[in-house]
């Protein structure tokens, strides 16, 4: 008993010594994590070189665009054919993908041989042979009468220019067909099929096997965005952001990049990592100096590396007693399969002995232990190198997405990964150590290359179908020049109806007289108070207007809130609160008890009877103070001032914010005779000839008309321009049937239009993989600021995804492009409609004055106009196009409503004083 224990101990020690000896000998092949991270860093640099336009020609890692722009989302369906050509045999496959809630793939396939004489004959012979095999397969399945889409896996070095165009760079793997190199292989197949004339197919995509692997796995796991092959050769692909791919135009979306990573190190980047054995393998290969990384990791070379190490150790008398056999000296006699077998057996030492005996050697126990260890070191290095380059790819994807923790799946194929007993496990373990902030899943591809080509085709079909469906839906929102001219014409008609005494009562565009009869002329001076009430906060302002050399406006203001109970209380309580705030402000400014002229911006629907008399028609914006509707707001304010008995104010003017905007800009630019607001709501005003303002007596001079143009279309005159989405937004609004024009152009509603379109797309499976989240059903989540952010040019899709994520919408890159497109279409229409309305206004002013050309300035305010990246530009272009005889400038108003009220007061005081003289 003791003897057997001693013997076992002796062998264990012996094995241990032998292992240490090999470890020391192959010290350079055992890579630390530090070294692997350094390799990952170098690989990152090589990736960037391959992607850059200027560095691509000299880059060793080519990073080739594949024109595959999306991975499967599980909704693909249909029948497809696939051809898989990558060696002496090729396969034809029929693939049916069904999506009825249960993703299912059915396949039929047949393998055809390519005879030696055809491989080395002409290209015409080769492609005729392929077409013949395809015809035979379709005959067998009785599908020759169908024109099916086909995906083609072509695993040779190619330059791809489109999804269905791929030029062969050079034959490999023993092929020598003449007249094919430099040609597009898709054209060659198409011609061969046409020569036969007995069937037709639609060749949609050419892919290589790595992309096929990613796509096959992507159908089962939508997180799959990397494809990896470690077999006879090695390569990888991954989904890159379009903005980083200099060789392909366009910045939006993603595209799969075929890395061709086998060539990593061809420029010397791995010289300090490569060993003498790697150099020897390379020198004896068919392509010296090329594919150096592949030669360190792939199955074609793994057994050969082990053989070279054993030969050198034997020559140095470290193995086999210094003896060599002819078999051991013959290239290719130690196979990668032997490496797998030796490492796979529980008793690997015994397997090592079998292999060594087969090679004509007489190994000792130590020799077998050493051989086992050499196999381990070579295959472990291979897995570690793969992990290092994958770590670089994952880091890049993680940075592209800006995620703190990345969840990603790698689709894998290849004999080394699948058949070596420990390779996969070592690869997974090392990779997780190198990228601890990534959760990685590995998915083995079953039948990657053939099924993958069908999947690429299925995805291309799905994308094309979905694109067509989306364009059809968005078509009614895209307005032609003729349609915009018609909107302009109708706006003009509605303006006339609002101005006319006869039709005013029934006109939706009310064209209300404001009793503001002049814009500033620059001689205004004095101190004025202004009140600005249009929401839950209101402002009190002191505005000092100076003329002469010191001409300008100086402002002081303070914001006060209106508590909910005051908004919903009595009118007296509301106006007492306002007067209390004025008193506080005057004290704050050190002007207690001073009497000043006051201008009042009151942004609620009113009927104005004179400059200082304005009857509130109805409260909006959540106000409900009783006893105010039907009353003159100036009287209510004056009564509250008298009740306080602390100061007296001369209320000179009541205006709305649009008029305020025009007056503020009019102080800077005497040509300013139009005011426009495009923010939460939208409205416009302009200087109309008194003779046309039939509601007010007098023919001389001009008066500013508050158009209330948001109600344009309330009589149905815009129904042929309104879409189902406009109708849906209107129905669910607080004032259904009212303010229809405003609902097509203003910030409060654009987000809702977008949300309704997105819901429609999602219901039809065109977006968010057909899943409607609770958030998407929530009204009002798409604020205007998000529309502005999403359309911002400097924002990458990554940030669009972040905005959608913030809104609780999980989106793919493709989804983000679609959301951006919808936002663009909706905002563009809004800007064009606004421009058409404005063109009607400026043309009316020109015609009123009988001018051939008019130079006029529009004062503008509002968040949509100011913050949206494209709204203003599109609106300006539209006005220019639809009113070519008007030279229109746009001036952004700074603080229109408060300052404007003070300026109207200043103008009124100037005119009053002139009248008194």
Swiss-Prot record:
Pathway: Carbohydrate metabolism; hexose metabolism; Carbohydrate degradation; glycolysis; D-glyceraldehyde 3-phosphate and glycerone phosphate from D-glucose: step 1/4. This is Hexokinase-2. The N- and C-terminal halves of the protein contain a hexokinase domain. In contrast to hexokinase-1 and -3 (HK1 and HK3, respectively), both hexokinase domains display catalytic activity. The region connecting the two hexokinase domains is required for the catalytic activity of the N-terminal hexokinase domain. The N-terminal half regulates stability of the whole enzyme. Residues 656-895 are annotated as: Hexokinase large subdomain 2. PANTHER family: HEXOKINASE, HEXOKINASE-2. D-glucose 2 binds at residues 603-604, 620-621, 656-657, 682-683, 708, 739-742. One of its GO terms (molecular function) is hexokinase activity. Belongs to the hexokinase family. ATP 2 binds at residues 532-537, 680, 747-748, 784-788, 863-867. It comes from Sus scrofa. Gene3D superfamilies: 3.30.420.40, 3.40.367.20. The gene is HK2. Keywords: Acetylation, Allosteric enzyme, ATP-binding, Cytoplasm, Glycolysis, Kinase, Membrane, Mitochondrion, Mitochondrion outer membrane, Nucleotide-binding, Repeat, Transferase. Monomer. Interacts with TIGAR; the interaction increases hexokinase activity in a hypoxia- and HIF1A-dependent manner. It is a peripheral membrane protein. Residues 521-655 are annotated as: Hexokinase small subdomain 2. Its EC number is 2.7.1.1. Residues 73-207 are annotated as: Hexokinase small subdomain 1.
